[in-house]
Amino acid sequence: MTAKPKTAPTDLDTLSKAKAKVELKRLSLEIERHNNAYYQDDAPKISDAEYDALRHRVEAIEAKFPELVSSDSPTQKVGAAPARGFAKVQHAVPMLSLGNAFSDDEVAEFLTRVRRFLKLDAEQIPAIVAEPKIDGLSLSLRYEHGKLVRAATRGDGFTGEDVTANVRTIKDIPHALAVAEPPAACELRGEVYMLKSDFLALNQRQETAGEPPFANPRNSAAGSLRQKDVAITASRPLKFFAYAWGEFSDLPEATQYGMLGWLKRAGFTVNPLITLCKSVDDALAFYRKIGEERATLPYDIDGVVYKVDRLDWQERLGFAGRAPRWAIAHKFAAEQATTILNGIEIQVGRTGALTPVARLAPVTVGGVVVQNATLHNEDYIKSLDIHIGDTVVVQRAGDVIPQIVSVVRDKRPEDAEPYEFPKFCPACGSHAVRDEDEGEAVRRCTGGLICPAQAIERLRHFVSRGAFDIAGFGETYVELLYEEGLVRNPADIFALHSKVDELKAALFRKRESLATQREEKTGKKRKSSLSEEKRQYTDVENLLAAIDARRTVAFNRFIFGLGIRHVGEVTSKALVRHFADVKAFLDGVDAAALARPGPAWLDLKNVRYIGEITLERLLEIQGGADTNEERQGFQPDARQRASLLSHYGNEEKIAGALQAARSEAPGPAFQQLANDSEIGEVATQSLIDFFEETNNRQVVTALMDQVQVERPAAASAKSPISGKIVVFTGALERTTRDEAKAIAERLGAKVASSVSSKTDLVVAGPSAGSKLRDAQKFGVKVLTEEEWAEISGNE
């Protein structure tokens, strides 16, 4: 059945007050849904342009009927209420959003309003600070006497989410202000974001881990910051630009531009492109220049923000509704195009995640030919009511991953059928079930090792650079040897020496197949030669030699190579610190399984306002402390009591739940891993789940019979770089980047990917770029590769 296109909105000139009231109610509900999707779920359902169009309609109706403006209107609110699971934080000064301009005329009108409000003479032109509008997550940082005490998301503008623990892992955010006389109290604000390159690398890790890719850098930054597991946030390459403030006990500067300088001196990163403009022409020239450079910037922006420079004028201008009169956002037009959706392909990752990919008729979007686009997940497809054959609007989300943002329903073919997400794995036919614990409700194949797609992805991961790193054992070999039945699990790779004839035959068949395809395509017959036979023999010998070279492997690479969900390179290295060898590792995971928290404990933990402090008190009581509190039982505060009553129903059930939770608290073996900031509860549970699967344990046992696992050499306490943070930049000539990193870690250093005020050393090779400039900015010691070789003993 063909869906009906949306009815065009009534023209404002003919819109009656009664109809306006109904439309405002509908628009308010629709905008609220999209606010929740964007701010709480980090999963927007519509494009920025579509969202702005909804808001513009509300503003236009309210301008005609000002008596219909209500306190719950979208024009009077910002963002969305804080999500459940985080403590609420009241902003001392509200974090309001900005009004938007979409044309040069609207920017000029903004400045005219400013001059009119301030009653400035014609020759008095207010200076304007122009800054790139970073597409990230707004954050407020509260400092008291120079120390970071709290970090909160914007939330609804008045109340945000407490993300202090997660924010402390972001290198760009100082824990103490680097100024001689810090204010008694201040709220400093800015944007958490992710570099495009880091986003692409993160998505590659997601794909390697068999997880769905993130939609764009903004969503991945927001989702990373709002993780309940701090270890996950710490593993994500988040960055922060400071650009504003809320409460401030004593402002040290009189202008916006001057305050940006103070923020830099205090230890924050301030966007270097920010410019002080003396006229509207200067501001618009900046906008055009940034627009031209947008594609080459290392981070995503969606416009330019203009702010009146003088702070006394900002104070006089004040606010109108949800936005300041002294600032406005000049938005970029979205890079979009329409094309035909030819089909949807389901890709199966290493952990069984089913990820939909749109196959499109080729179309150019922002100068790039797009044939594939992300559809995120099952719920996203349903929300857009996607049919195969639809005409769809494609947008380069975040200038990186193309995505389908809407359907042109009036162009839908009569025979188009709605897309049904598969309930069975397309690779093995096993049931595919929704994992409701995932933020995006991912559907996963239950086939495990019998699923060829998962098995092939796991084998690819096993031989990859960060794992066993078997040279030459690429994607082609993995697929070929799996299809030929020669390699079905990692241990089979090391048994290929006993199957040399079968291996040669498999390679011969593959080459013959490719040659036949070439002959059919070109019409030219291939001549067999001795050189081809020799090449085939050499390929086999080289492959077997590369395999032999990896029969001894570092402990952390062994763990990472197993492809355990949520156990990446950082977590693998952390696990090595806890266990002496593989046997101790397996025994430790088994002990953690026996010590894992029970359902009653987990249920209590998920009750609102029952946080880590409460859980720790329960643990103390569980330990049998002979105190009055132990005899009387744990006493929640009023807020916790109300939440417990809402969750359990009555006092008797609360008492029973507390008693049950105490008996099901996690034991030391579980806590040892879960409390490590680089492991965390999620990875600990994944380890338990992995080794409780008999097939997985058998694979590991078989692998241990084939390889020797060696523990990394202990870090030298006497090393001159022990405990220091080191960053490598530029092209290294003596060693590879991975080798240099391994040497630094062996000597007790921590290797970081970016330079901050906390960095101790930067090793700069030829063609060093922004990291070298950052080192000079922060006063970090810079070493040449020769100097590094000398202090690391790698001459």
UniProtKB/Swiss-Prot annotation:
<dbReference type="InterPro" id="IPR004150">
    <property type="entry name" value="NAD_DNA_ligase_OB"/>
</dbReference>
<feature type="domain" description="BRCT">
    <location>
        <begin position="716"/>
        <end position="795"/>
    </location>
</feature>
<dbReference type="GO" id="GO:0006281">
    <property type="term" value="P:DNA repair"/>
</dbReference>
<dbReference type="InterPro" id="IPR013840">
    <property type="entry name" value="DNAligase_N"/>
</dbReference>
<feature type="binding site">
    <location>
        <position position="191"/>
    </location>
    <ligand>
        <name>NAD(+)</name>
    </ligand>
</feature>
<keyword id="KW-0227">DNA damage</keyword>
<dbReference type="GO" id="GO:0003911">
    <property type="term" value="F:DNA ligase (NAD+) activity"/>
</dbReference>
<feature type="binding site">
    <location>
        <position position="331"/>
    </location>
    <ligand>
        <name>NAD(+)</name>
    </ligand>
</feature>
<dbReference type="GO" id="GO:0006260">
    <property type="term" value="P:DNA replication"/>
</dbReference>
<keyword id="KW-0520">NAD</keyword>
<dbReference type="InterPro" id="IPR001679">
    <property type="entry name" value="DNA_ligase"/>
</dbReference>
<dbReference type="InterPro" id="IPR018239">
    <property type="entry name" value="DNA_ligase_AS"/>
</dbReference>
<feature type="binding site">
    <location>
        <position position="307"/>
    </location>
    <ligand>
        <name>NAD(+)</name>
    </ligand>
</feature>
<keyword id="KW-0235">DNA replication</keyword>
<dbReference type="InterPro" id="IPR036420">
    <property type="entry name" value="BRCT_dom_sf"/>
</dbReference>
<feature type="binding site">
    <location>
        <begin position="97"/>
        <end position="98"/>
    </location>
    <ligand>
        <name>NAD(+)</name>
    </ligand>
</feature>
<keyword id="KW-0464">Manganese</keyword>
<protein>
    <recommendedName>
        <fullName>DNA ligase</fullName>
        <ecNumber>6.5.1.2</ecNumber>
    </recommendedName>
</protein>
<dbReference type="Pfam" id="PF03119">
    <property type="entry name" value="DNA_ligase_ZBD"/>
</dbReference>
<dbReference type="InterPro" id="IPR041663">
    <property type="entry name" value="DisA/LigA_HHH"/>
</dbReference>
<comment type="similarity">
    <text>Belongs to the NAD-dependent DNA ligase family. LigA subfamily.</text>
</comment>
<dbReference type="InterPro" id="IPR010994">
    <property type="entry name" value="RuvA_2-like"/>
</dbReference>
<keyword id="KW-0460">Magnesium</keyword>
<feature type="binding site">
    <location>
        <position position="451"/>
    </location>
    <ligand>
        <name>Zn(2+)</name>
    </ligand>
</feature>
<feature type="binding site">
    <location>
        <position position="425"/>
    </location>
    <ligand>
        <name>Zn(2+)</name>
    </ligand>
</feature>
<dbReference type="GO" id="GO:0046872">
    <property type="term" value="F:metal ion binding"/>
</dbReference>
<dbReference type="Pfam" id="PF01653">
    <property type="entry name" value="DNA_ligase_aden"/>
</dbReference>
<feature type="binding site">
    <location>
        <position position="428"/>
    </location>
    <ligand>
        <name>Zn(2+)</name>
    </ligand>
</feature>
<dbReference type="InterPro" id="IPR013839">
    <property type="entry name" value="DNAligase_adenylation"/>
</dbReference>
<feature type="binding site">
    <location>
        <position position="131"/>
    </location>
    <ligand>
        <name>NAD(+)</name>
    </ligand>
</feature>
<dbReference type="InterPro" id="IPR001357">
    <property type="entry name" value="BRCT_dom"/>
</dbReference>
<dbReference type="InterPro" id="IPR033136">
    <property type="entry name" value="DNA_ligase_CS"/>
</dbReference>
<keyword id="KW-0436">Ligase</keyword>
<feature type="binding site">
    <location>
        <position position="445"/>
    </location>
    <ligand>
        <name>Zn(2+)</name>
    </ligand>
</feature>
<keyword id="KW-0862">Zinc</keyword>
<dbReference type="Pfam" id="PF12826">
    <property type="entry name" value="HHH_2"/>
</dbReference>
<dbReference type="Pfam" id="PF03120">
    <property type="entry name" value="DNA_ligase_OB"/>
</dbReference>
<feature type="binding site">
    <location>
        <begin position="48"/>
        <end position="52"/>
    </location>
    <ligand>
        <name>NAD(+)</name>
    </ligand>
</feature>
<dbReference type="GO" id="GO:0005829">
    <property type="term" value="C:cytosol"/>
</dbReference>
<feature type="binding site">
    <location>
        <position position="154"/>
    </location>
    <ligand>
        <name>NAD(+)</name>
    </ligand>
</feature>
<dbReference type="Pfam" id="PF00533">
    <property type="entry name" value="BRCT"/>
</dbReference>
<dbReference type="InterPro" id="IPR012340">
    <property type="entry name" value="NA-bd_OB-fold"/>
</dbReference>
